[in-house]
Amino acid sequence: MINKNFFIYIVIIMFSFFNKTMSDNTKTFFDFKINSINGEELDLSSFKGKTILLVNVASKCGFTNQYDDLQKIYDDLKDKGLIVIGIPTNQFGGQEPGSEKEIKNFCETNFNITFPMTSKYEVKGANAHPIYIWAKDTFGKSTVPKWN
């Protein structure tokens, strides 16, 4: 069963629905780039027209089993335009200590993850990946992750 916190993150992070543009100088979700877990640049503009579920994850978290739910959602809805993007972070209790290679191996071996995963990033605070800073500035503090 998908837990309550997982649904909270879905509601908070599915900001691609809002793709609002307040002026020509305002960024949107699709203006960002992020490194994949393989070290390649992932240009989010390639997902225009899709619904994006951006979720921070960790391999040693009590919610690690959410990978099963994320993969199921991705499998069920990818043909309808849903893209799940997992962003590993070590900011919550040191629960993602591994390298990108270790994280990728863990996800593929234990959960058969096929949705895009990124490099490990900070998701809150001054050193957060710019997409998280943008989300906070654009949609408010409620978009700042509180846990994995």
Language model: regions and residue ranges:
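A short, hydrophobic beta-strand/beta-hairpin element that forms part of a small beta-sheet core
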Residues: 146-148
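Bacterial N-terminal signal peptides that target proteins for export
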Residues: 1-8
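Local sequence-structure signature of Cys/Sec-based thiol-disulfide redox active-site neighborhoods
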Residues: 48-53
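N-terminal "domain-start" segment that seeds a small globular fold
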Residues: 22-45
